[in-house]
Curated annotation (Swiss-Prot):
Gene: psd
Protein family per UniProt: Belongs to the phosphatidylserine decarboxylase family. PSD-B subfamily. Prokaryotic type I sub-subfamily.
Residues annotated with Pyruvic acid (Ser) modification: S252
Membrane-topology annotation of the record: Peripheral membrane protein
Described purpose of this protein according to its UniProt entry: Catalyzes the formation of phosphatidylethanolamine (PtdEtn) from phosphatidylserine (PtdSer).
Key words, A-Z: Cell membrane, Decarboxylase, Lipid biosynthesis, Lipid metabolism, Lyase, Membrane, Phospholipid biosynthesis, Phospholipid metabolism, Pyruvate, Zymogen
Cofactor section: pyruvate
Protein name per its UniProtKB record: Phosphatidylserine decarboxylase proenzyme
Annotated localization: Cell membrane
Organism: Pseudomonas fluorescens (strain Pf0-1)
Coiled coil: none
Free-text description of this protein's post-translational modifications in UniProt: Is synthesized initially as an inactive proenzyme. Formation of the active enzyme involves a self-maturation process in which the active site pyruvoyl group is generated from an internal serine residue via an autocatalytic post-translational modification. Two non-identical subunits are generated from the proenzyme in this reaction, and the pyruvate is formed at the N-terminus of the alpha chain, which is derived from the carboxyl end of the proenzyme.
Subcellular location, principal: membrane
Length: 286
């Protein structure tokens, strides 16, 4: 009964209004308030600050600065195995595996379309048909910057408006096509393994998504918007393996897509496996 009421509330709550209010709170610079809130949050979610570049939670100018905190040098060493494909973020594997019939497995009884995930552009979706996916969920306690699994040159970024359902096991099991309905930013790169997509999926209370090349990605009007970076008028944007790609101001999910026969997932990884940015998720196929 409790789970059912929670799911019903997900459809009734004013998602974007709540996220705007959360954004105001997260950017508040009133010292006593931001210190109290940040301290409470760190204790409530058992945030490990020992690896943070700034360990004192009260030293951040606002909650968002704390939430998107940088880590100390060496805190996330990159797997040096030749051909390793890195985890883009700290978190847990929600699902990973093959893309079958153009759909990505979400949870028992649920899947979603690659085409819809990437904003409805068939040309963007086509290279990933029959390919592979990995979905990494970032919990509140995690490091919330997203990094490159593989070196790549940015071809296109697509902002896709949508709902902002909470993202957790309950919603994954009960909200159809959850990740293709939530607001998200799809980044498509050209890599040595062919096209790679990294999709940053928002969630309720996620105030914003940023990328290192565009900053805050929320167009004034919440409508689908495509930004192309392979045109002569724009300087190429190349990011090395392990380089920061973007960040969540309050977190959610990163989904990585590859084409057919390009990668093989690490056998030990399965749904629920904890991962850290920089560890190997997969190995390039020869």
């Amino acid at each position: 009964m409790k789970e059912r009421l929670f799911i019903i509330s997900q459809y009734l709550l004013p998602h974007h209004l709540l996220s705007r209010l959360a954004g105001c709170i997260a950017e508040c610079r009133v010292r006593w308030f931001k210190n109290a809130f940040t301290t409470w949050f760190a204790k409530r979610y058992q945030v490990d600050m020992s690896q943070a570049l700034v360990e004192d939670v009260t030293a951040y100018e606002h909650f968002n600065a704390f939430f998107t905190r940088a880590l100390k040098d060496g805190a996330r060493p990159l797997d040096q195995t030749p051909g390793a494909i890195l985890s883009p973020a700290d978190g847990a594997i929600s699902q990973l595996g093959p893309i079958e019939h153009g759909r990505i497995f979400q949870a028992k009884g649920h899947s979603f379309s690659v085409l819809e995930l990437l904003g409805g552009d068939a040309a963007n979706a086509a290279p990933f048909m029959g390919g592979e996916f990995a979905t990494v969920y970032l919990s509140p306690k995690d490091y919330h910057r997203v990094h490159m699994p593989l070196a790549g040159t940015l071809r296109e970024m697509v902002y896709i408006p949508g709902r902002i359902f909470s993202v957790n096991q309950t919603t994954a099991e009960n909200v159809p096509e959850l990740f293709a309905r939530n607001e998200r930013v799809a980044c498509i790169f050209d890599t040595e393994r062919g096209p790679m997509a990294v999709v940053l999926v928002g969630a309720m209370i996620v105030a914003s998504i940023e990328t290192v090349w565009a900053g805050l990605v929320t167009p004034p009007k919440r409508e689908l918007k495509t930004f192309r970076y392979d045109e002569a008028a724009r300087a190429p944007i190349h990011l090395e393996k392990g380089a920061e790609l973007g960040r969540f101001k309050l977190g959610s999910t990163a989904i990585v897509l590859f084409g057919p026969d390009q990668v093989k997932w690490v056998e030990e990884l399965k749904a629920g496996s904890p991962v850290q940015m920089g560890q190997a998720l997969a190995q390039s196929n020869a």
